[in-house]
């Protein structure tokens, strides 16, 4: 494909239909069909809803669903990466409690990035995924005024269990 090849033409008719049927971007891991909706790596999202989040993470990184052994391996890898470096909790405690939750999340993610980055996209992405349940739990509790007595994280628990604990 050349840099000057016309990929599509947009007319005023398209604007009146919400761009239905007009490609607005490309993505190697997902696509949308009018009948089955969103697909990740070729699988309809309705089918993937029955899988554990850890298995979907494996799918997005490897473009295939994991075997039972691979599923155990990614869970172990996420558990090994789960501990948040530094004292993110102290940083979060300095934020205004009435701040927007997305601003809190942004500060938390940026703090994690400042405390530890490998400059390898896969390593950094896996670290962030593994640490998100704890980060979200800290944000919810601290914003809600329940910063005292936050239970320790259990990295061996599933991502969902860590998030709701």
Report residues per predicted region.
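Hydrophobic alpha-helical bundle cores within soluble ligand-binding/oligomerization subdomains
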Residues: 1-165
């Amino acid at each position: 494909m050349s840099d000057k090849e016309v990929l599509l033409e947009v007319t005023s008719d398209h604007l009146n239909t919400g761009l239905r049927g007009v490609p607005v971007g490309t993505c190697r891991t997902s696509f949308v069909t009018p009948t089955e909706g969103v697909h990740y790596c070729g699988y309809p999202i309705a089918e993937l809803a029955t899988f554990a989040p850890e298995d979907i993470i494996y799918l997005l990184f490897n473009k295939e669903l994991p075997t039972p052994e691979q599923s155990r391996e990614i869970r172990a890898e996420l558990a090994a990466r789960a501990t948040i470096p530094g004292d993110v909790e102290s940083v979060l405690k300095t934020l205004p409690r009435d701040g927007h939750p997305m601003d809190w999340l942004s500060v938390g993610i940026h703090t994690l990035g400042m405390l530890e980055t490998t400059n390898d996209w896969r390593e950094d992405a896996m670290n962030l995924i593994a640490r998100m349940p704890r980060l979200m739990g800290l944000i919810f509790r601290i914003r809600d005024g329940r910063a005292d007595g936050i239970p320790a994280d259990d990295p061996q628990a599933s991502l969902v269990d860590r998030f709701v604990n």
